[in-house]
């Protein structure tokens, strides 16, 4: 990147294309296409007794067994093949579209929008850091932790990994399948959902709008005109160039990889990259207008649907990820604001979107509690990407606002969702909830969970603080160089090597792991350092600087798409079941041989005693072990059958 100059004009690109530096975006939220202690027992026996995720069950009972069927309510693979690239969430084009809208709003508001001087006039005297985040370990990483992070080896990281039992992985696969359906709600067939998944379809956000006779704000022709102004090839080129430039200035924070050289013409495209800057530096009235739009029923940021498990009394709420323009506006409005008037900071855009979805889902929550009773009604929230973050916030809002008792809220399970809170673990502790109340499943190289929890370069942090006063006293940014800290339990999913290269911190081969440690101060610090190490390897800037990350077959889509999570989980389940069967057969063979040896010796002694006494005429065969008799008969029959078949060949 030596010799790169920032030009104020763009070569070969129409000036009508407003774009944004994707290095700050990190592809937030789009759907773009405990170890066993019974060593003496075989794994197929011990896994039935050891349940590191037993808290997932309802009332201590296990859910109905069964693997995920391939012929479920909707054929996912067919949907993925037939989905148009414009419909599956082209995140770069969405960012460009958002940038143009925000830029227009800033111009209509009558200001250039948000330099440091303007922001100082608008923002009142900032609250002290202690007011929003008291002295605690939840949002602070001291120098010792940084040294520990640097010195942590692959072996130490692997010591904190525990494989998830197969039956729990099957439940995650079932939820991932249902989360995949959230992207094709109109195609859901209730009869198939009931037949294959034993779930009764209740309602969806689409049906809600139809029942309320609210017309969808569908400006198809206008959107087409906007899309014609944006060339996808140029968009990907701009994103790669912007990320590469920032990547070259941030090599110190990247544990792997190296920077790539870019030419001057390509670097000049960064001059028009202001989408994220337009959002961060926008005036408060513009942000509030967008926040009001996110809360409205007319243009919801994400679709969702509801289904019931009548056997367990559980109502499932599934929310899709970023698949609309409104959802991308929620993603880019990432400044921190207080959550529910508590001393915890949250992503503003996602919080505003959660308020609207909360109001839409509240009647369905009350209806389920009234029909089943509070002691027998349970609620499960889940979602992919942005939908997972919305599920978490709606779940916590129901508890904080006193609408649902804590006993009715099952753990929230997210797939590829970003971290959106600063001090989230402390909030769970205050609410009396365990960390296992949030189970975040992350693909080993998914960029979205890393987006807000990776180490931000000092240049990026200074820029955010200069553009927006809310970042100047942000505890996570000041203490950890991250926007939002991880919370809850982290589960890492590694697919097969044919699907994606393995992660250097994980064992070879596919698997689903829980990153956990014992509940002590020292191990908690080590756990936080391990999470930071994982979220920075690979660093999002390294992913964005690779041109192979973009497009319908790029790394970003492949490692983040909801169908990828489902395929990886199914592969892990098949692999574990096959390995368990092999271990069980081997254990039975050893048991059979040992039984023959000990029983055969006793039989021989008994035969000798009877023959010596001449008391009776006995057939020796009755003194042989019954297992040996069965196996002998089977071998004889099998031998003759083989000879019979070979005779006809």
Swiss-Prot record:
Task: Kindly list the GO CC terms recorded for this protein.
Answer: chloroplast; chloroplast membrane
Q: Where in the cell is it found?
A: Plastid, Chloroplast membrane
For this protein, the Enzyme Commission number is 3.1.1.32, 3.1.1.26
Q: Which residues form the active site?
A: 385, 446, 560
Q: Which GO terms describe its biological process?
A: defense response to insect; lipid catabolic process; positive regulation of defense response
Q: What is this protein's name?
A: Phospholipase A1 PLIP3, chloroplastic
Question: How is it placed in the membrane, per its record?
Answer: Peripheral membrane protein
| Catalytic reaction(s) noted | a 1,2-diacyl-3-O-(beta-D-galactosyl)-sn-glycerol + 2 H2O = 3-beta-D-galactosyl-sn-glycerol + 2 a fatty acid + 2 H(+); a 1,2-diacyl-sn-glycero-3-phosphocholine + H2O = a 2-acyl-sn-glycero-3-phosphocholine + a fatty acid + H(+); 1-hexadecanoyl-2-(9Z-octadecenoyl)-sn-glycero-3-phosphocholine + H2O = 2-(9Z-octadecenoyl)-sn-glycero-3-phosphocholine + hexadecanoate + H(+); 1-(9Z-octadecenoyl)-2-hexadecanoyl-sn-glycero-3-phosphocholine + H2O = 2-hexadecanoyl-sn-glycero-3-phosphocholine + (9Z)-octadecenoate + H(+)
Provide the induction entry.
Induced by abscisic acid (ABA) and cold stress.
- Other comment: Plants overexpressing PLIP3 exhibit stunted growth and accumulate anthocyanin under normal growth conditions.
The residues forming the transit peptide are 1-26
Q: Which family does it belong to?
A: Belongs to the AB hydrolase superfamily. Lipase family.
EC top class, as a word? hydrolase
Database matches in PANTHER family: PHOSPHOLIPASE A1 PLIP2, CHLOROPLASTIC, PHOSPHOLIPASE A1 PLIP3, CHLOROPLASTIC
Please tell me the species this chain comes from: Arabidopsis thaliana (Mouse-ear cress)
- Impact after mutating residue 385 to A: Abolishes lipase activity
Annotated function? Sn-1-specific phospholipase A1 that catalyzes the initial step of oxylipins and jasmonate (JA) biosynthesis. Hydrolyzes polyunsaturated acyl groups preferentially from chloroplastic phosphatidylglycerol (PG). May function downstream of abscisic acid (ABA), and provide a link between ABA-mediated abiotic stress responses and oxylipin and JA signalings. In vitro, possesses broad substrate specificity.
State a single Gene Ontology molecular function: galactolipase activity
């Amino acid at each position: 990147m030596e010799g790169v100059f920032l030009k104020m004009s763009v070569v070969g690109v129409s000036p009508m294309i407003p774009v944004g530096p994707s290095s700050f975006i990190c592809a937030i939220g789009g759907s773009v296409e405990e170890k066993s202690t019974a060593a003496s027992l075989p794994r197929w026996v011990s896994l039935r007794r050891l349940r590191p995720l037993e808290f997932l069950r309802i009332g201590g009972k296990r859910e109905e067994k069964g693997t995920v069927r391939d012929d479920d309510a909707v054929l996912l693979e067919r949907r993925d093949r037939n989905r148009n690239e414009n419909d599956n969430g082209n995140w770069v084009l969405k960012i460009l579209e958002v940038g143009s809208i925000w830029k227009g709003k800033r111009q209509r508001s009558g200001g250039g929008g948000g330099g440091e001087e303007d922001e100082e006039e608008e923002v009142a005297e900032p609250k002290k850091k202690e007011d929003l985040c008291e002295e605690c370990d939840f949002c602070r990483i001291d120098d010792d932790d940084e040294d520990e992070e640097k010195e942590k080896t692959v072996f130490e990281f692997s010591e904190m990994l525990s494989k998830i039992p197969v039956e729990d992985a099957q439940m995650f696969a079932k939820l991932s399948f249902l989360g995949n359906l959230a992207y094709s709600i109109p195609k859901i067939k209730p009869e198939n959902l009931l037949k294959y998944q034993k779930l009764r379809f209740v309602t969806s956000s689409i049906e809600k709008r139809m029942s309320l006779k609210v017309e969808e704000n569908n400006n198809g022709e206008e959107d087409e005109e906007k899309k014609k102004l944006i060339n996808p090839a140029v968009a990907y080129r701009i994103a790669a160039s912007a990320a590469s430039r920032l990547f070259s200035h941030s090599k110190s924070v990247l544990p792997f990889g190296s920077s790539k050289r870019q030419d001057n013409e390509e670097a000049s495209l960064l001059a028009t990259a202001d989408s994220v800057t337009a959002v961060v530096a926008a005036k408060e009235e513009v942000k509030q207008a967008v926040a009001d739009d996110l809360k409205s029923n007319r243009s919801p940021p994400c679709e969702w649907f509801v289904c019931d498990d009548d056997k367990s009394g559980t109502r499932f709420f599934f929310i899709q990820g970023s698949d609309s323009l409104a959802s991308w506006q929620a993603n880019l409005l990432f400044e921190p604001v207080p959550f529910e008037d508590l001393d915890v900071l949250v992503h503003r855009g996602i919080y505003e979107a959660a308020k609207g979805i909360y109001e839409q889902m509240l009647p369905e929550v009350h209806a389920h509690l009234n029909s089943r009773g509070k002691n027998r009604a349970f609620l499960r929230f889940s979602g992919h990407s942005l939908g997972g973050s919305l599920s978490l916030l709606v779940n916590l809002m129901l508890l904080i606002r006193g609408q649902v008792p804590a006993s009715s809220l099952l753990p929230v399970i997210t797939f590829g969702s970003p971290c959106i809170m600063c001090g989230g673990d402390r909030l769970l502790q205050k609410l009396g909830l365990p960390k296992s109340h949030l189970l975040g499943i992350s693909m080993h190289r998914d960029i979205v969970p890393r987006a807000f929890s990776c180490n931000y370069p000092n240049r990026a942090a200074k820029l955010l603080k200069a553009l927006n006063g809310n970042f100047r006293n942000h505890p996570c940014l000041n203490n950890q160089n991250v926007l939002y800290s991880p919370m809850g339990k982290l589960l890492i999913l590694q697919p097969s090597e044919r699907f994606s290269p393995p992660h250097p911190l994980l064992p070879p081969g596919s698997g689903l792991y829980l990153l956990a440690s014992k509940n002590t101060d020292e191990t908690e610090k080590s756990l936080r350092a391990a999470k930071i190490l994982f979220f920075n390897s690979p660093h999002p800037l390294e992913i964005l600087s690779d041109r192979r990350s973009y497009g319908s077959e790029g790394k970003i889509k492949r490692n983040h798409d909801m169908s990828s999570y489902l395929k990886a989980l199914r592969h892990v389940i098949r692999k574990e079941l096959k390995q368990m069967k092999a271990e069980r057969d081997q254990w039975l063979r050893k048991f059979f041989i040992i039984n023959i040896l000990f029983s055969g010796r006793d039989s021989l002694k008994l035969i000798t005693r009877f023959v010596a006494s001449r008391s009776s005429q006995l057939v020796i065969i009755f003194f042989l072990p019954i297992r040996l008799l069965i196996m002998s008969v089977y071998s004889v029959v099998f031998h003759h059958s083989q000879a019979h078949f070979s005779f006809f060949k």
